[in-house]
Amino acid sequence: MKTLSIDIETYSSLDLAKCGVYKYTEATDFDILLFGYSADGNPVQVVDLASGETIPPEVIAALTNDDVTKWAFNAQFERICLSRWLRDHGVFDNAYYSIPEDTVGNYLDPSSWKCTMIWSAYMGLPLSLEGVGAVLGLGKQKLTEGKALIKYFCQPCAPTKANGGRTRNLPENAPDKWAAFKRYNIRDVEVEMSIQEKFAKFPVPEMVWEQYHLDQEINDRGVALDMELVHQAIAMDTRSRADLTVAMKKLTALDNPNSVQQMKQWLSDNGLEVDSLGKKEVAEMLKTAPADLQKVLLLRQQLAKSSVKKYQAMEKAVCADGRARGMFQFYGANRTGRWAGRIIQMQNLPQNHLPDLAEARGLVRCGDFEGVELLYEDVPDTLSQLIRTAFVPKPGYKFIVSDFSAIEARVLAWFAGEIWRQEVFEKGGDIYCASASQMFKVPVEKHGVNGHLRQKGKIAELALGYGGSVGALKAMGALEMGLSEDELQPLVTAWRNSNQNIVRFWWDIDRAAMNAVKYHMDGEVCGIKFCCQSGMLFITLPSGRRLSYVKPKLGTNQFGRECITYEGIGGTKKWERLETYGPKLVENIVQATSRDILCYAMRTLSHCFITMHIHDELVIEASPGVDLKVLCEQMGRTPPWADGLKLRADGYETMFYKKD
């Protein structure tokens, strides 16, 4: 046997969406109900485990044989579930695939697993089996009754008089439904195999599978949580919200001061008309509101802070050994191949600005509500700032947090050949000061000569690198930072004039992509290759990885200009036709290349215990003797395919995760 395509149906009393597959399989009642498989492309078989059937010995052997490639759609689910099931059946025990000091858990080695969901994402398609089937027009899509059957057999049911008070539906409770469920299981394997056939001409490069396997190892390893801090933070938030609600009721006499509608009406009755009670809007109102209304708005701000949701997610996801696993979705952003967050959502953790973070953390950890309230006043904000600190290294270890310095700006300058910017990076200069200096033709130093211009340099750098104009400056908060409306267009013009190679790069990329779609003409710009093939626009990066745009064609944008359109997941999370153009493609290319550089660093440091990666940052669980400087030097090495690109990684050591 060379390959095994698999789909399983499982039961657990835990909510998979809320806790993730690692915790899901730790439920005492977890079990595999159906095991659908095809060995070496033969007709699909289904093993009805729930009814007492057994998986053939040669298939069991293949699951633990690293010479057999296992395929599944979202293979992580099958791999982790089967790891638990095989352990329960005495087939697979104490078979750690890493060294004893690692915490990858007793899971099947991911190196012999491949995932058609990842292949689909690599091809620019959705991350759901139904979505991929619909886009590819596969005849054997998931049966529409599938979701209802999963809910019926795979999740606990409410006890009722009609069902005899049972809390779980078994095959004998609905034989017809069970027969349909088995057909559905077979269909899933067939669809998964059809996807492989459809994509056979466009294999995923081996380096991407290696990245996937490293990603799975990091997800298996997980990261330790300080559960004492988590529990105390949740308890403190509950008390804080109760106190704030009482205070609000006293001031407003409202039945429910948390109600947006009631609060808007109360403010209106007190002379303050509001359209929204969003964070920005409340901050603006606080500048001009009378003192009595300011007090109410400040309390409203504190009540609206969702500081506890991340802690609750941690509580739901933490495994029996105190670690959270499965937090990173490989290829979650399929335009660039970047990761997406799962469960705790590491990519959008609140920042920390408290100067005495460790002291605040200590007070919360020991449940000193009065101390926190006395020293920090805003309890929800304090709890929010402490969320990162719930992630801790295992006993006897430290965290080394290292990230790339201005990686996107460096990659953009390298691609475009913007020499002055590359020189700034090479000399370790401040790009915001240097940008302001280029735009306004005067020296600019942070906290020094013309230091006030640095802010303009910063906002321009953040907003204008990918074709942004006045609207992008506003969206980035230029007006709130003190710039006036009539300063914005001159700032755009000044930035573009001082970065002419970048502007040229935008439109060279635009032209190459347009030629590929319009004339099927292959092209190359700065080492980036374009071609149209089998109804796909492919952009090949210097790393060798391809970006895929599905069913590209020409359209007309809102300005009446010819543009490229393609199919993808839009802002509404639905599959739709999207527009793109040169600067937007440059953003995809730069972010994708930055992602590839991070992957190169992860491979370089794969001998370390990487526990987390957030944007361009790695968090490593290191023994006390590991040298920070050496680790940062290794992370900052330039990949062989990026000759001339100047990288730098900076880091710090800490006993709990934080933003330094």
What are the residue ranges of the model-derived segments?
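Active-site palm subdomain of RNA-directed nucleic acid polymerases
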Residues: 199-207, 211, 597-618
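A common structural junction motif
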Residues: 481, 635-643
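A short acidic-Thr-Gly-centered motif at the start of a beta-strand
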Residues: 1-2, 60-64, 383-398, 603-605
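Active-site-proximal helix-loop-helix substrate-binding element of RNase H-like nuclease domains
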Residues: 27-37, 41-200, 355, 435-440, ...
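Short active-site loop/helix that positions an aromatic residue
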Residues: 76-91, 123, 264-269, 405-419, ...
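Generic long, charged, amphipathic alpha-helical segments
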Residues: 431-452, 558-606
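Conserved catalytic palm subdomain of right-hand nucleotidyl-transferase polymerases, strongest
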Residues: 5-6, 73, 114-115, 391-407
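Conserved "right-hand" nucleotidyltransferase catalytic core of DNA-directed polymerases
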Residues: 1-16, 27, 34-36, 124, ...
